[in-house]
Amino acid sequence: MLSRNDDICIYGGLGLGGLLLLAVVLLSACLCWLHRRVKRLERSWAQGSSEQELHYASLQRLPVPSSEGPDLRGRDKRGTKEDPRADYACIAENKPT
């Protein structure tokens, strides 16, 4: 017959093992759910890719390679000479700290 201390150790170990197993199952379920959601978002993103995104270079009015970004050939010519003080680097330099 086992002593009382041995029983506590056995049942405590089984309880902790059960909790660990439960945690692994819950984390696996969350990971599977997240994986399915990412796949669904990727599919919806691929279907919506017909709309062109703004390319960083187009936002800075820089030349954009023809394979990337929107076609800017027909844009308004007024906005090409912007105030250079509006550039992020200039704002960061002039910002009082």
Curated annotation (Swiss-Prot):
- Domain of life from the UniProt record: Eukaryota
Where in or outside the cell is it found? Answer: Membrane; Golgi apparatus membrane; Endomembrane system
- Which residues does the annotated region (Disordered) include? 59-97
Expressed, tissue-wise, as follows: Expressed in lung, tonsil, thymus, placenta, kidney, fetal spleen, fetal liver and brain.
Transmembrane spans = 8-28
The family assignment reads: Belongs to the LST1 family.
- The protein's name in its UniProt record: Leukocyte-specific transcript 1 protein
Species in which this protein is naturally found:
Homo sapiens
